[in-house]
Design a protein with these regions (language model features):
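Glycine-rich anion/phosphate-binding loops
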Residues: 19-22, 61-62, 84-100, 129-130
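Glycine-rich, proline-tolerant flexible connector loops at the mouths of alpha/beta enzymes
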Residues: 39-61, 86-88, 109-127
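Conserved, mostly hydrophobic/aromatic
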Residues: 23, 30, 81, 103, ...
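N-terminal amphipathic alpha-helix/helix-capping segment at the start of soluble metabolic enzymes
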Residues: 1-20, 29
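Hydrophobic faces of well-ordered beta-strands that scaffold small-molecule active sites
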Residues: 17-20, 38-40, 78-82, 107-109
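Active-site mouth loops of central-metabolism enzymes
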Residues: 11-24, 57, 80-90, 148
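Generic structural signal for well-ordered alpha-helices
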Residues: 3, 27, 64-67, 71, ...
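Conserved small/polar residues in nucleotide/adenosyl-binding loops
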Residues: 142-147
Length: 159
């Protein structure tokens, strides 16, 4: 499914189940099970590559490499967790660009401070609204409408 058709699919306004995957094999299994989309979380990469909790230890490169290996093998869209964008607004823009090149259909960016913590862990901090707006604006300035339209979403860490 191409990104434009994923956008059309999301516009249908019904639930899209996107199971969490952590490598190309788990992605293939999920695709063969019939799922329409997949979700690559920062936690899954931290657990499987580092054997650690999701506390901001993974790098942009580790996530982009894992994403590229997955999208090389599956045809369904992959939503990827960009954590906090791996830095400031310019880093976040670079992250979105890199993830788009690696085949992401959608990128999720959190509004946490550093060090970030997995959503279910205590001790999270939220960045100032202006800082998060700067990150989102940087992403939107990069993601102009195109045949490879990349959607960007935000998950509030306070939820």
């Amino acid at each position: 499914m191409t990104n434009p058709s994923f956008k059309t699919r999301l516009a249908r306004n019904d639930i899209v189940l996107a199971p969490g995957v952590y490598d190309a094999l788990s992605a293939l299994v999920a695709e063969q099970a019939g799922f329409e989309a997949l979700y690559l979380s920062g936690a899954s990469i931290a657990y499987t590559r580092l054997g650690r909790s999701d506390v901001g230890l993974t790098t942009f490169t580790e996530v982009a490499d894992t994403l590229a290996r997955i999208t090389e093998r599956v045809r369904v869209p992959v939503i990827v967790d960009a954590d906090t964008g791996f830095g400031n607004a310019l880093n976040t823009q670079r992250t979105v660009r890199g993830f788009e090149r690696a085949g992401a259909a959608m990128v999720q960016i959190e509004d946490q401070g550093f060090p970030k913590r997995c959503g279910h862990l205590d001790g999270k901090t939220v960045v100032p609204v202006g800082e998060m707006c700067g990150k989102l604006k940087a992403c939107l300035l990069y993601t102009s409408p195109s045949p490879r339209d990349l959607s960007t979403s935000r998950m509030p860490s306070s939820a």
